[in-house]
Every structure is written in structure tokens, then in C-alpha cells.
């Protein structure tokens, strides 16, 4: 790690570290989306299988902070795939989230969302989380208090932006290759 990099915790670099609703409102046929970890895809949430809840229940959850904002980092924190499903939320829908998903909102004066996203996606961080921060035997999970104390190394903002541009370029090439492979397989 270079000397200009800083070491901090998730709690110190985020303005918000929370999770979704700990209660599950009744499903309705028409209403607002309510997403859980089962609705994760590699690059977003799949709303085709999302539950719907009443607008009244949705508004209560929105006021409780269970609705992500654009560029929030969403992390699946419960179940067999805990800390595998990680996205930067960039979709226009405004779902309420269940407690199986953590919401991280970075303090952009310290860390840009994309930098934290790529940090959390790195194999070494994932291994560290599974080895040192996970709990639960029947249903593995990471709890918010452990999220908050996780260490994160980060450079100055201008260097974060340079690194992110490299990672984004690689990610875009991977996505293009996957599309080509899927077309060839079809």
C-alpha cells in the first residue's frame, strides 16, 4: 500500500450503513417493489420476480431508510451467497429493501462509490469478510456492526477516479465478451 493511501473503516467512509426492513409487509398484486437478496443479478436488481407491497407500507419503509438512492452500494448480507452479491444501484426503480440487503452510502469527500464497490468485489476482501466477519451457522450472514468495523484502504479521490476508470474499462470488456459468448451459444 502506498504511503498516500489511508486506512479507515466502512463506518468512517460512509455517511450511511444500514439495511432493509426487518419486517415483511403483506404482498399485494399492484403496488411498490420490495426487493430481497433473491432479486440480485450481477449488475442490478431483477424486478420481474420482486414482491409488491402497498404504497402505504412502502412509504413507511421509505421513511425508515429502506429505499436505496442512486449510487448506493447494495450488498447481499444473508444466506449462502452473503457478500457475493454486490452492486452499485443505478436503476430508476425505487424499491424498498428487506434486511437481507445492506445499503452503503459513501461520503464522497473520502471515497467515491465505484471505488468502494470494486474494493468490496475484490477476492481478497471477500475472503477476509468470510473468514473474519461472517456469523451464523444455519444462515450465514454479516451483521451491520461488523460491516461498520471492516477496514478499507483508499487513495486520494483523484487516484480513486483513475483506478475506477481502469476497472470500468475491464468490466465493460467482460460484459461485451459475455454477450458475445451468449450469442454464440444461442
Residues of each region from the PLM?
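A short glycine-rich beta-alpha junction/loop motif
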Residues: 94-101, 114, 134-164
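Flexible, active-site-proximal loop/turn residues at the rims of small-molecule/cofactor binding pockets
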Residues: 41, 80, 156
Amino acid at each position: 500500500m502506498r504511503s498516500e493511501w489511508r486506512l479507515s473503516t466502512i463506518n468512517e467512509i460512509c455517511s450511511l450503513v444500514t439495511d432493509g426492513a426487518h419486517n415483511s409487509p403483506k404482498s399485494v398484486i399492484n403496488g411498490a417493489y420490495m426487493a430481497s437478496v433473491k432479486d440480485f443479478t450481477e449488475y442490478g436488481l431483477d424486478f420481474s420476480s420482486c414482491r409488491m407491497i402497498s404504497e402505504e407500507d412502502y412509504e413507511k419503509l421509505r421513511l425508515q431508510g429502506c429505499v436505496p438512492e442512486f449510487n448506493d452500494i447494495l450488498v447481499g448480507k444473508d444466506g449462502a451467497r452473503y457478500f457475493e452479491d454486490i452492486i452499485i444501484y443505478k436503476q430508476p426503480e425505487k424499491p424498498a429493501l428487506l434486511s437481507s440487503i445492506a445499503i452503503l452510502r459513501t461520503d464522497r469527500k473520502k471515497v467515491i462509490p465505484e471505488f468502494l464497490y470494486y474494493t468490496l468485489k475484490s477476492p481478497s476482501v471477500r475472503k477476509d469478510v468470510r473468514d473474519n466477519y461472517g456469523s451464523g451457522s444455519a444462515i450465514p450472514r454479516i451483521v451491520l456492526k461488523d460491516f461498520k468495523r471492516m477496514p478499507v484502504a483508499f487513495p486520494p479521490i483523484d487516484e480513486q477516479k483513475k483506478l475506477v476508470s481502469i476497472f470500468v474499462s475491464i468490466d465493460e470488456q467482460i460484459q461485451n465478451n459475455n454477450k458475445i459468448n451468449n450469442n454464440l451459444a444461442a
